[in-house]
């Protein structure tokens, strides 16, 4: 698929989803089953409005069935499922209608809170609709088929995805709301993060831990918190706080490295460096608030990391405990303002060299 976009100065190629692959393979197999004609390509429409022409692979057939595959192309997105072949076996069945099942390498949902009910194959609603719509285009009137989607290698690849955390076992999910993979899509990551919250909420949890990365997650686990209650949100703290309110959570522990959380102290809730990288400026402003001289402020402004800035601040005679507490208090205040005081929030501020350097907010009892 040779369609591109430009992001952060880089030319990136679009791909197509496992849902598009499943729909295309199902349409191709159905067409070949009823016409007896072998085809090399198949055309489908996607919810995004793009028309795809995809290569049909590994065609096999027998009495009353045809099976074929479509290779997943994730474009320039870092997608674990890129290169997998999504197969569809289409069999004649008595009566009319289309029945869709999951086979080898397609996960099974085990927990509530997902778009698919527990016990069902992890074929999301939009891909399921795509499969049905594309097959109907080539299914003769009055005929019925049984469709089985399979993904050889899917069970192994699924371990590299969110599925284990989401309670989807045995394989990958057949996904895609648009049919198209947008490279480096923020929306795809946000959707995955929201699913984690959705599952915890469906299980009755009211308390959750948010960590921007591994430092916060590792710290929370050392504190004895259950790993599945810890969500690594990356850069999307604002989004996750909003969703925590939406899903009825009452308590959030925010545990993270000062390099991420100092941005939150200044009211920055998307902490990606391309959105806002003002760490040095924020710390310089705060150390000036603590009475540091211009030389110290300049050194902090020139620092490469927040850890280096802390060293500079400490050498200048500023009480690091008080300074860190000031930051933690502001993180807490900004988060409370962001959710209009609808969550109880506890902040744990971490330094690589110093460990936990400050806590603020309401103590969350587990």
Curated annotation (Swiss-Prot):
E.C. number(s) listed in UniProt: 2.1.1.195
Gene3D superfamilies: CbiD-like
GO terms, biological process: anaerobic cobalamin biosynthetic process; methylation
Keyword Nucleus found: no
Reactions mediated catalytically: Co-precorrin-5B + S-adenosyl-L-methionine = Co-precorrin-6A + S-adenosyl-L-homocysteine
Top-level taxonomic group: Bacteria
Pathway: Cofactor biosynthesis; adenosylcobalamin biosynthesis; cob(II)yrinate a,c-diamide from sirohydrochlorin (anaerobic route): step 6/10
Keyword set, alphabetical order: Cobalamin biosynthesis, Methyltransferase, S-adenosyl-L-methionine, Transferase
Name of the top EC class for this enzyme: transferase
One function term, GO molecular function aspect: cobalt-precorrin-5B C1-methyltransferase activity
Family statement: Belongs to the CbiD family.
UniProt xrefs under NCBIfam families: cbiD, PRK00075.1-1
Protein name: Cobalt-precorrin-5B C(1)-methyltransferase
Source organism: Thermoanaerobacter sp. (strain X514)
Gene label: cbiD
């Amino acid at each position: 698929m040779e369609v591109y976009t430009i992001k952060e100065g880089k030319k990136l190629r679009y791909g197509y989803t496992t849902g598009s692959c499943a729909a295309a393979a199902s349409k191709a197999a159905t067409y070949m089953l009823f016409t007896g004609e072998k085809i090399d390509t198949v055309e489908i429409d996607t919810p995004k409005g793009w028309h795809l022409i995809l290569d049909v692979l590994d065609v096999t057939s027998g009495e009353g069935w045809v099976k074929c595959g479509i290779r997943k192309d994730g474009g320039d997105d870092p997608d674990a499922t890129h290169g997998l072949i999504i197969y569809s076996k289409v069999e004649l069945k008595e009566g009319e209608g289309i029945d869709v099942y999951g086979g080898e390498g397609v996960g099974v949902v085990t927990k509530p809170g997902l778009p698919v009910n527990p016990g069902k194959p992890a074929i999301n609603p939009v891909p399921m609709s795509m499969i049905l719509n594309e097959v109907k285009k080539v299914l003769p009137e009055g005929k019925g088929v049984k469709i089985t989607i399979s993904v050889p290698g899917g069970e192994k690849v699924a371990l590299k995805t969110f599925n284990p955390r989401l309670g989807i076992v045995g394989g990958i999910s057949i996904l895609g709301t648009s049919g198209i993979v947008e490279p480096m899509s923020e929306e795809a990551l946000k959707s995955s993060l929201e699913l984690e919250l959705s599952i915890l909420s469906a299980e009755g949890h009211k308390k959750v831990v948010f960590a921007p990365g591994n430092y916060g997650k590792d710290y929370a686990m050392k504190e004895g918190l259950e790993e599945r209650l810890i969500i690594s949100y990356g850069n999307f703290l604002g989004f996750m706080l909003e969703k925590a309110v939406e899903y009825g959570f009452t308590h959030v522990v925010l545990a993270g490295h000062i390099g991420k959380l100092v941005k939150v102290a200044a009211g920055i809730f998307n902490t990606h460096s391309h959105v806002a990288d003002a760490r040095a400026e924020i710390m310089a402003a705060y150390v000036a608030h603590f009475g540091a001289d211009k030389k110290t402020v300049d050194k902090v402004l020139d620092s490469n990391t927040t850890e280096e800035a802390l060293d500079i601040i400490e050498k200048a005679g500023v009480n690091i405990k008080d300074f860190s507490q000031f930051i933690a208090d502001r993180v807490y205040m900004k988060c409370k303002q962001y959710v209009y005081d609808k969550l109880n929030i506890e902040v744990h501020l971490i330094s690589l060299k110093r460990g936990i350097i400050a806590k603020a907010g309401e103590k969350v009892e587990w």
